[in-house]
Amino acid sequence: MISRIDLRGDALPEGSALRDLLPRADFDVSAALEKVRPICEAVHHRGDAALIDFAEKFDGVRLESVRVPARALADALEQLDPAVRAALEESIRRARLVHREQRRTTHTTQVVPGGSVTEKWVPVDRVGLYAPGGRSVYPSSVVMNVVPAQEAGVESIALASPAQAEFGGLPHPTILAACALLGVDEVYAAGGATAVAMFAYGTESCAPADMVTGPGNIWVAAAKRYFTGKIGIDAEAGPTEIAVLADSTADPVHVASDLISQAEHDPLAAAVLVTDSVELADAVEKELEPQVAATKHIDDRIVPALKGRQSAIVLVDGVDEGLRVVDAYGAEHLEIQTADAAAVADRVRNAGAIFIGPWAPVSLGDYAAGSNHVLPTGGCACHSSGLSVQSFLRGIHIVDYTKDALADVAHHVVTLAEAEDLPAHGAAIKARFGWKVPESK
């Protein structure tokens, strides 16, 4: 059901040579970019009318309005299953605890007497958040996007999720209920690239946003790339990934269940086990069969994901080699199921999120650990981070110098300006001192 890659025996290659040996999904955003271009431009030129036409084309429902009425949000919350409401409320509570601690404070550094630099953190004015609604419905993604934006102090928050024909063109009621729980009352029935374009350009119903965040399919990722430079984005999120670094102490039942848990997202989802134990590899492979047979989404998601080129059991000589492999892979989710798992986890450099030991499965992080589940995919964990309060903040440097403080460093500024052949830069200093360079004290 899942392939094997044997990296034992020979020394592991370095850098890209090692990455090329590891499984990865085919996820070509560049190819999708040309297909989303006309969609985005239609929204630009036709506004709400284009959104309504695309909802009919892609979602099979003709909308009267893309803006979700307040009554629909209230009704969705009122009709929400009490157990689901309690679970969402706990997820929100835990997420707030973690994200509130991420707030940044203004800090001033006195560089010299009379000269200081202050770093002030300012939230983005307006954000557009996206919650997918394709194969599955993700109210948890509403929580993971809204909470850090709110804790960052963003004043204007809008959310989009695809129109559902089953619900009269509204987004899924659980999505709407999650919005109501979080106090988000600006919600739109728009999906995929159309939602990103709506937030980027603005329409008659929706003011443009400064930033768009949230997971989605390849069309969402392509639209984000299309608008890079015009608006801020969190990341071009691809199919979900789990990597498990495990040794002989790991429970194969746990490992198999965790691999399956992420494979059920998408046929392109990646499930990777890295281990130095052939016995564990055999046991996990054997355990996959009955667990897969006992769950849902077998033929359309789980089996294609596990059998795909993006999933594998990778055999290594030891935990040290396993660490090199998982760092080269840069998984969205990385579980450490080894002896002394915390110490091993401390050595990891590249991962979207790390889950330590047998009692911290990825599913916990998906819903209620308090961490954020909007994470870098496709190996981007080597340079990117998951969604956080920081994602919605901008650091502004405030420079405050007295005349004496400027005079003390003026000759250095002029020297560097002349070295770069930018004499007007130096002149801006000289102009303040009678067109002379003051002597430093």
UniProtKB/Swiss-Prot annotation:
Residues that hold Zn(2+) according to the record: Q262, H265, D366, H425
Cofactor requirements of the protein: Zn(2+)
One GO term of the biological process aspect: L-histidine biosynthetic process
EC number: 1.1.1.23
Pathway: Amino-acid biosynthesis; L-histidine biosynthesis; L-histidine from 5-phospho-alpha-D-ribose 1-diphosphate: step 9/9
Residues that, per the record, bind substrate: T240, Q262, H265, H333, D366, E420, H425
Cited PANTHER family: HISTIDINE BIOSYNTHESIS TRIFUNCTIONAL PROTEIN, HISTIDINOL DEHYDROGENASE HDH
Protein name: Histidinol dehydrogenase
Pfam families xrefs: Histidinol_dh
